[in-house]
């Protein structure tokens, strides 16, 4: 009886996570804070608002200052999309490959910290790319590498300049 109850709770949580990226990030995503280490991803109200704007529009440009957590938000949004939508492709483009790689690293950290019942498993896992068993993937490239020309229109692009 208890085992059946646990399975039902997990199923309900999975559905809730799939339907609500804010809930998923706040409840299950961990981030690396520069001074406090591994902490829960407690989104600020402006991050939640930004996420809703990103979800409503196909094309977005964000003019921002540094250290607002927008890259971390993009990592959480990318992970959510990868987990709950099969064959999702995320292309991270930045002026330097290391900058793009940092976002992939954030996605990997968030994934690694998830409870086991949310994990799908990797097919490919390296510093520049992650591919999940459901066909979803994220790749990091530099803007100098003709990034947009070699990938089809079915990629969700995250560009950091």
Where are these regions (language model features)?
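Phosphate/NTP-binding elements of NTP-utilizing enzymes
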Residues: 2-161
